[in-house]
């Protein structure tokens, strides 16, 4: 009996401990919350929400409940949720110009707005906004003013570049353009003055992945990282959990593959020279990738040759290369291996393929549908299957595929997307 009692007490204590760690929400009116904030010499954090608002629910259930959020907010703010649709809250929502949900406003105990956040944000971003509101951290604008006074301070420049994307996303119209132009000019300046040789650390590597996302024939940044792969990997690994080599390899591979495909689509035969780097100075970066029985070089060569052939409208060569790729990759073939070439075919031929191409696509789609995938992806694949069957003289099977697509579309969470796809399906059915 004692053991049972202690177990129950332990479980209750654990539950209460979890609850106390999350954000404490004041139960009462806005005016009562303001009075409490004045008494406790705290500021006010107001979460304006509505019952129908999905992002509001995400913030309430996945962010406000986190211990790190609760610890900071409970010690610095009186926190309250205000339902904007309640009649007694209309005036307060109007006063603080709530035009989108969720809107979270930091308010001083004398009623002055300190800062606001619109839309769902991750916990670290919300805590940062709270620290800016309390004056513990600089706002982005204040940080930029600091940079203008100390233009040789690499730490300030680094922080600006890291914070810029999130900040710019919150801006509209002219302000977004203004700040975008300022940051676009800051990155080359930072790179020129600090030098790539001194950027072998996690923060600077992140900046490179944010602002240098494409490569070209002459790219000293790409070439330096490729030449100093181990040095960069070690520098990144010091500051992050996980494998620094993997992070640097992904960066190089993504840019190199994209450039190869870009050359293929343009019909530039120099893609073969770029392919040679896969077995050359980029060999270590590509070492962790598996393509079934194919070597990395052979697999990427098949995909590149297939893309080159497709954009030259050499249909037979395209399918031959892709079939060889699928055979070589075998059981490790993934969903994207099918969906990407299907998408490329749709772009190049704009729905006007040969009967042989439609039959080939039917086979690929059937294999793709065996994988797990989101409802919108499955809906689109079933619609494509219907199109292929329609163009190979099988209207009954096409109708069946369109109907199946309509049923699956009901599972799509994004209602606007669901309605658009359902309308397209109905038009396809009418066209049979």
PLM feature segments, named:
Residues 1-25:
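Bacterial Sec-dependent N-terminal signal peptides
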């Amino acid at each position: 009996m004692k053991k049972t009692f202690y177990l129950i007490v332990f479980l209750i204590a654990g539950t209460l401990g979890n609850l106390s760690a999350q954000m404490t929400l004041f139960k009462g009116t806005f005016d009562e919350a303001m009075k409490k904030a004045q008494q406790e010499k705290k500021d006010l954090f107001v979460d304006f929400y509505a019952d129908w608002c999905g992002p509001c629910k995400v913030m309430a259930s996945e962010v406000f409940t986190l211990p790190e959020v609760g610890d900071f907010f409970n010690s610095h703010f009186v926190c309250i949720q205000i339902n904007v649709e309640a009649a007694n809250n209309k005036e307060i929502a109007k006063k603080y110009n709530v035009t989108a949900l969720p809107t979270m406003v930091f308010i001083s105990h004398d009623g002055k707005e300190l800062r606001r956040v619109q839309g769902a944000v991750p916990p670290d971003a919300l805590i940062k906004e709270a620290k800016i509101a309390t004056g513990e951290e600089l706002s982005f604008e204040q940080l930029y003013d600091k940079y203008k006074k100390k233009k040789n301070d690499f730490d300030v420049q680094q922080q600006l570049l890291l914070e810029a994307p999130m900040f710019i996303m919150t801006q509209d119209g002219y302000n977004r353009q203004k700040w975008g132009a300022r940051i676009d000019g800051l990155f080359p300046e930072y790179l020129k003055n600090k030098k790539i040789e001194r950027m072998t650390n996690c923060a600077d590597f992140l900046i490179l992945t944010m602002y240098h996302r494409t490569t070209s024939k002459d790219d000293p940044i790409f070439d330096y990282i490729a030449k100093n792969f181990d040095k960069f990997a070690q520098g990144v690994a010091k500051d992050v959990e996980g494998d620094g080599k993997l992070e640097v390899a992904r960066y190089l591979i993504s840019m190199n593959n994209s450039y190869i495909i870009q050359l293929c689509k343009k019909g530039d035969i120099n893609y073969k020279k770029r392919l040679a780097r896969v077995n050359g100075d980029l060999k270590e970066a590509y070492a962790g990738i598996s393509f079934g029985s194919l070597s990395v070089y052979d697999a990427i060569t098949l995909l590149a040759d297939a893309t080159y052939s497709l954009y030259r409208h050499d249909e037979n060569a395209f399918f031959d290369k892709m079939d060889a790729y699928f055979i070589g990759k075998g059981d490790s073939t993934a969903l994207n291996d099918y969906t990407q070439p299907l998408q490329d075919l749709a772009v190049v031929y704009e729905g006007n393929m040969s009967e042989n191409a439609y039959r080939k696509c039917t086979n690929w789609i059937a294999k793709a549908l065996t994988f797990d995938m989101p409802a919108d992806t499955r809906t689109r694949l079933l619609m494509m299957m219907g199109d292929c069957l329609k163009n190979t003289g099988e209207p009954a099977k096409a109708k069946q595929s369109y109907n199946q697509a309509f049923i699956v579309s009901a599972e799509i969470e994004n209602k606007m997307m669901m309605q658009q796809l359902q309308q397209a399906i109905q038009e396809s059915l009418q066209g049979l």
